[in-house]
């Protein structure tokens, strides 16, 4: 049986509560964006692809930079605080948009905060958690994050049911965002900023350059394979658009989105437990193959009930993969953990822009079925690549696998 969540360190629990409220705010907005862009503002599937892709690319570039800064003494706390603050301030401004390009702009600025905060936060979680519990710690954090998404989606649905329009719902997202920032200030009070464990030699001095070159060969192949898996994972805005195309009414979308995150939240901690016991290699492969199967099925001529069921099944993909991927990165980069997470998040997030453009254009110019089946086939190939290059077991100890 999986151990209780009491095994998770207090700092991880606190950061999980912050993520819960932040995603509460974020997911009051995100599931409404496809309808807001395409029906209120007159955009199309390509605009949605650009929306997802541009925002994730911006976030990814900042994750690379933030990850490098996170390994410097005293930087983690301000990076985490600044990242959450910017999201709280900018996210409600989406309600003021009068054109699709404005939504893209506000969403990009919103994701700046995510880019700043994510690597130092994940590095802090890895730092305070014993190696053998990291899968569960990240699973606990992701579970709380997804539970916040459940609450946000339900809040959006409730407000729509009471007659609020989409703009009003987006504006109300400022409330849980402010709560998240207040909780964060309490959590980080007394948390000592990461003091560098990286000596001059470990920072990449010439004396150990051959060691760094050798170890980087261990880090890069699995991370690049994860990037390929991310690329072929169809953007969620297009998945929402697909179920709308299959007859799902717009007012029901926030409720269905909440159901997706119920599945994600419930499966995240067990997924972390599986990663700790079976290893990320098997768990990530299972998640990728599940996505490929569901994407293929969504491409068929199905009714709204079947589309909803398949969409909810996608929640297991995140539950199986997210915590295992993060635990693997922490083990591959035990010294430069911030840099490792920066590279991982930057590459996997950076894959979203070309993916959004390609799949959005394919959806718009050909069909939803073409986009989904291309995604499914590519995902199957990416999983095969992952099985070839990913480590069958994770190395322990203090070796650093980054140049």
Positions of predicted regions on the chain:
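Helix-loop boundary and gating motifs at the non-cytosolic
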Residues: 5-56, 220-256
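Intracellular juxtamembrane helix-capping segments at the cytosolic ends
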Residues: 116-129, 320-333
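Symmetry-related core transmembrane helices of the 12-TM Major Facilitator Superfamily/SLC fold
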Residues: 168-186, 372-387
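C-terminal transmembrane helical hairpin of 12-TM major facilitator-type secondary transporters
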Residues: 281-325
């Amino acid at each position: 049986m999986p151990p209780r969540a009491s095994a998770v360190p207090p700092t991880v629990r606190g950061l999980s509560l912050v993520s819960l409220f932040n995603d509460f705010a974020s997911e009051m907005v995100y599931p409404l964006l496809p309808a807001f862009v395409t029906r209120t503002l007159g955009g199309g599937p390509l605009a949605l692809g650009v929306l997802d892709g541009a925002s994730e690319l911006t976030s990814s570039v900042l994750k690379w930079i933030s990850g490098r800064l996170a390994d410097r003494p005293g930087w983690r706390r301000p990076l985490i605080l600044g990242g959450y603050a910017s999201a709280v301030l900018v996210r409600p401004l989406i309600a003021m948009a009068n054109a699709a390009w404005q939504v893209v702009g506000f969403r990009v600025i919103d994701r700046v905060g995510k880019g700043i905060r994510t690597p130092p936060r994940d590095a802090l979680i890895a730092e305070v958690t014993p190696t053998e519990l990291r899968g569960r710690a990240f699973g606990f954090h992701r579970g709380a994050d997804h539970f916040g998404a459940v609450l946000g989606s339900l809040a959006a649905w409730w407000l729509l049911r009471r007659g609020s329009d989409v703009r009003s719902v987006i504006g109300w997202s400022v409330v849980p965002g402010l709560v998240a920032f207040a909780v964060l200030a309490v959590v980080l009070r007394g948390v000592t900023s990461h003091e560098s464990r990286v000596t001059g030699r470990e920072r990449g001095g010439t004396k150990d350059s051959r060691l760094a070159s050798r170890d980087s060969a261990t880090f890069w192949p699995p991370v690049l394979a994860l990037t390929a898996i991310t690329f072929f994972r169809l953007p969620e805005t297009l998945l929402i658009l697909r179920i709308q195309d299959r007859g799902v009414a717009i007012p029901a979308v926030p409720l269905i989105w909440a159901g997706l995150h119920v599945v994600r939240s419930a499966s995240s901690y067990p997924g972390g437990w599986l990663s700790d016991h079976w290893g990320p290699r098997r768990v990530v492969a299972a998640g990728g193959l599940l996505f490929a199967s569901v994407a293929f099925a969504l491409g068929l001529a199905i009714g709204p009930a079947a589309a909803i069921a398949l969409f909810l099944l996608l929640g297991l993909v995140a539950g199986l993969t997210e915590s295992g991927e993060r635990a693997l990165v922490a083990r591959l980069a035990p010294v430069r953990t911030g840099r490792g997470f920066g590279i991982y998040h930057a590459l996997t997030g950076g894959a979203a822009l070309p993916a959004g453009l390609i799949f959005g254009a394919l959806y718009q110019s050909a069909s939803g079925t073409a986009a989904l089946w291309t995604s499914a086939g590519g995902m199957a190939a990416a999983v095969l690549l992952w099985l070839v290059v990913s480590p069958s077991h994770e190395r322990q100890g203090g070796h650093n696998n980054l140049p």
